[in-house]
Amino acid sequence: MASQPPAAVEARLADLCKELGVDEGVAGEAAAVLEEGKGALLASPSFGSKSPEDAEKLCFAFVLYCVSKLKETKAGSSGVRLWEILKGCKLKYDDFFKESQRLASRIDQVLGSRYGSDWEARLELKQLENLVNLLADASRFYCKAFNELFLSPSTDQEPGSTTNIPDYIRFGWLLFLILRSKSPELFKDLVSCIHGLVAILAILLIHVPAKFRSFTIEGSSHLIKQTEKGVDLLPSLCHNYHTSEDRLKEMMGKSYKVIEVFFSRKAINASEFKTVNLDKIDTDGLMYFKDLVDDEIFQSNLEKLEKLSSTTGCQGELDLEMFLTSNDYVLNAENSSGSSANFGCSKRVFETLASPTKTIKNMLAAPSSPSSPANGGSIKIVQMTPVTSAMTTAKWLRDVISSLPDKPSSKLEEFLSSCDTDLTSDVVKRVSIILEAIFPTKSIDRGTSIGLNCANAFDIPWAEARKMEASKLYYRVLEAICRAESQNNNVNNLTPLLSNERFHRCLIACSAELVLATHKTVIMMFPAVLESTGLTAFDLSKIIENFVRHEETLPRELKRHLNSLEEQLLESMSWEKGSSLYNSLVVARPSLSTEINSLGLLAEPMPSLDGIVARQSIHPDGLPPTPSKRWPSAGPDGNCYPQSPKRLCTESRNSLVERNSQTPPPKQSQTGLSILKAKYHPLQATFASPTVSNPVSGNEKCAVVGVQIFFSKILKLAAIRIRNLCERLRHEELTVSVYNIFKQILDQQTALFFNRHVDQIILCCLYGVAKVSQLSLTFKEIVNNYKREPQCKPEVFRSIFVGSTNRNGGFGSRHVDIIVFYNQVFVPTVKPLLVALMPSSTRPEDKRNTNSQIPGSPKSSPFSNLPDMSPKKVSSSHNVYVSPLRQTKMDALLSPSSRSFYACIGESTQAFQSPSKDLAAINSRLNYPTRRINTRINFDMVSDSVVAGSLGQPNGGSASSDPAAAFSPLSKKSKTDS
């Protein structure tokens, strides 16, 4: 491509613009942008195995979309739409979104200079990608459900018939698109879309001739709900698809109105109309439209829908009709067949974190007991798709949370009133303000920042419903946390915790995020809740584990979502500029304060509730009365407990640096970074101001506790990823050394993580250890294997922050690839640690080590010095995992008959017998080569769901599907629960 004349590229772009009918202004500006960024855009290594022609098409599509979108929003003109661009370039949506992120990073300066610093937010690429995912999931659900209810196209056609099944399925999809254009809530989330599609299916079941059904009404397994009058249609569909009957009835009413207006037909009560379609169906509450799909008029009705769809379905950047008719054009071949396909570079959380792919195809399959002759030997495994996952979690929200009161319970009020001053009104007011900021209903500019060509993106009923769900979930978890803290501290007065503004906001943000994740919204993706609440990623990382631990009914899919969020927070977001992690580090590690201050990394003060109200233009009407200021002063950073929610957080960002610049560093353990002590750290210490003394041990600041907890989670995440990557490379022998180097860097060279991604340090550690170990392992091999990891993002190894000093002595920054970073930054910083590995591997005294294991003992774990990960993989070649015994199973195992079991709480198998004899017997059994086990496993003791939930991926994902187990600090409770 580099050898081609420069004019050839511009000529092909001009030809494409003519073919698409792009106006001269957009075409000329696109050519100018391409000319400025051509060198970076057309660098072929970015595109991997793609041909130069495909790479060029992707560049053209990206430039055209950027110019058309940004010029439109700037000048108000209408440009070419994304679906037209991709169709003209013969590209799939997922290919475009996969490459757009890296292309955007390459011409960031070009677009920023032309369209302003907010150009990336105005492009709405992430929202569009999620909308594509939603519509593809919805269309697959609709096609699958339709094929279950109606005959296949090959068997339905009758002689003389002018209508066939493809026409009916197309009719239903187009009707859904019309309904969607009239119902704003269908725009926002997958759950609402499914309710709309189920309503369309119900209408088709009533109106499509019965001869096209794949079942008979009587005795059907599709419609199992019965009344005295016959099959109860809507409850049966709700049972099949986990929808809400109330919402489905509401959606049916909206569908009736759309049909009445569009087809100019009067809806009549189905009970008043006699037709074979309604035989044996309870018609109470159902409406019927005469001649809606009859042969004589059906084709004209379908043409009307197609004509309207051509104008309403393509108003935005996407051609919505295409998701049904050309789904193979939307998706790649490898993604189009699976019901849980991935789109673009964003992995689905619950698939990325699923358990071993070699033995279990999808850990979201409904758990079932092992097949046996007693149960017929065959069990139907229900595969969990994005739709079934969303509907299952929505059912949990509907059944468990929606029935709760929308105010503090009597027990929670007891905790709030037991504080130094009654905090009930403060809590209620805070919930109202923060949730209004997340789900705006009263603000003047409601919906203007959401985009995606939807002026009323947050319509009031939808936002009010989500606010109600989030507030109920918040009150429920807050009460559970209060109960646990009261029991652990043996006090009912929880003033330090319950008056902590940051703690409450984190809990509210987590509740709102789960509500958004449950409904699979496309207009408000993470980290939107952080921006709305004034929190940082480090703040939210403190609450996730406690949230999971104290909400016992949380579905597995939502636990996986929180697990994925925590990984994002740990790996990069908490290390970004403006993270409150740096405010804690300057207290816990004063030696880092100079560099933190020079880089400008400190977080801004958390905005007060008054500031949030002013920013959102929230009208005070409808909000609880403002609580009076009861506390004369507050701790720094808005965290100390003597603070009302109304306090303005005005402390300077640099005050922590100035205050602690002369403070001696805290005493550390011999190993440098100390993993958390066994003692219990209350939540108040985690959320307290960094400069406040720890209530458990007054000789250390609360910042030390927070940093220790955070670093312990970083180490666990790194241990899992190092193990997986070493196994992929077939160099398991490097695992411990790489982990130890990483651990030392985190402790001794923490600044190496600033503004960077954890995986960048892992990759450099792996290459550095391989070099000093004299292994022929190249960076290319490491990166190629890293690309196969589920968390891989190209920018991890292509764009790494490097600080630099300009000519005027000021500090600047630039981004380089991982090899440049390794040579210029990593090696000079870590060289002493790497050199220390060289003599240790060949030291003679190591070979004469007298502390070798006792002969006959089982081989020690190669990961014995890693933090306690649960479950732990003990074999690189087999899917074998070991996890501590759950507390819930302890009592059942401690029956008198179970005393003969080995290794049960370390007790001897016989009275007064030495434990060494038991250990010798265990070793003998483990090492006996011809040992046979004649007993059968009793699955009654531990359920399949527990076993399945404890498995981890052999070559990717978290080692535990439970974030409380995989990322919890090393406390007694977390070890037990893991």
Swiss-Prot record:
Region span, Domain A: 385-585
Domain of life: Eukaryota
Region spans: Spacer: 586-704
Annotated InterPro entries: Cyclin-like_sf (IPR036915), RB_A (IPR002720), RB_B (IPR002719), RB_C (IPR015030), RB_fam (IPR028309), RB_N (IPR024599)
Low complexity bias spans: 958-971
Molecular-function GO terms, alphabetical: RNA polymerase II transcription regulatory region sequence-specific DNA binding
Region Domain B, annotated ranges: 705-832
Annotated stretches, region: Pocket: 385-832
Localization terms from the record: Nucleus
Cysteine disulfide links: none
GO cellular component terms attached to this protein's record: chromatin; nucleus; transcription regulator complex
Region Disordered, residue ranges: 616-645, 841-878, 947-978
Polar residues bias: start-end ranges: 850-864
Gene3D superfamilies: Cyclin-like (1.10.472.10)
Main location: nucleus
GO biological process: cell differentiation; negative regulation of G1/S transition of mitotic cell cycle; regulation of transcription by RNA polymerase II
SMART domains recorded: DUF3452, RB_A
Keywords associated with the record: Cell cycle, Nucleus, Repressor, Transcription, Transcription regulation
Function text: Regulator of biological processes that recruits a histone deacetylase to control gene transcription. May play a role in the entry into mitosis, negatively regulating the cell proliferation. Formation of stable complexes with geminiviridae replication-associated proteins may create a cellular environment which favors viral DNA replication.
Entry similarity comment: Belongs to the retinoblastoma protein (RB) family.
This protein's name: Retinoblastoma-related protein 2
Organism annotation: Oryza sativa subsp. japonica (Rice)
Gene: RBR2
